[in-house]
Design a protein with these regions (language model features):
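Anion (oxyanion) recognition and catalysis
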Residues: 19, 26, 60-64
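Oxyanion-hole/transition-state-stabilizing segment in secreted/luminal serine hydrolases
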Residues: 1-13, 40
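A short helix->loop->beta-strand "cap" motif at the edges of active sites that frequently abuts
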Residues: 23-31
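Short, amphipathic alpha-helical segments
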Residues: 8, 12-15, 49, 53
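Catalytic His-Asp segment of secreted/periplasmic serine-dependent ester chemistry enzymes
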Residues: 37-152
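Amphipathic, non-transmembrane alpha-helical secondary structure
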Residues: 12-19, 23, 113, 117
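Generic anion/oxyanion-binding catalytic loop in active/binding sites
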Residues: 3, 21, 101
Length: 152
């Protein structure tokens, strides 16, 4: 069995593809909400690197151009990972020493729950009326007020 070849689209093709989804959603009467990619856990000398720059920028530009709600998961998850720190954030990703597995892209269950929490927090910012339906705190375990103190 061979591993599938990774498939990538440059940011222009990616934006065109996402734009098609927005158009289709609107044609079907849905209200689209765009979400930038989840940050990868990639640190260099203690600094978290943005590995999705052009993709995230493409989604942000499309959301602005098409007047579509945006949850900036890339920004929020980078804030979250910085707040956790390099070593503690490892526990949220697929690091399985017994299987010699180190995966800083895919999440363990607790990481998936935390990221879902970030998405809900972003959704609540888009629609304050959702607050009454949210039954779980959405600080996502970040220390202090890392998410609410953001300046940008």
């Amino acid at each position: 069995m061979t591993k599938a070849t990774p498939k990538y689209a440059d940011d222009t093709v990616y934006q065109i593809s996402v734009d098609k989804v927005v158009t289709l959603a609107r044609e079907k009467g849905a209200t689209p909400i765009l979400i930038t990619p989840l940050a990868r856990r990639k640190f260099d000398h203690g600094q978290l690197l943005d590995t999705h720059g052009l993709y995230s920028q493409a989604v942000r530009a499309l959301a602005e151009r098409e007047n579509v709600g945006l949850i900036d998961l890339n920004r929020d998850s980078m804030d979250w990972l910085r707040a956790l720190g390099e070593a503690p954030s490892r526990d949220f990703f697929m690091h399985v020493p017994a299987q010699n597995q180190t995966d800083d892209t895919h999440l363990q269950h607790r990481g998936a729950v935390a990221v879902a929490c970030l998405v809900v927090a972003g959704w609540k910012q888009l629609d304050a009326g959702l607050q009454e339906y949210v039954v779980r705190d959405t600080d996502c375990g970040a220390r202090g007020t890392a998410l609410s103190d953001r300046t940008t």
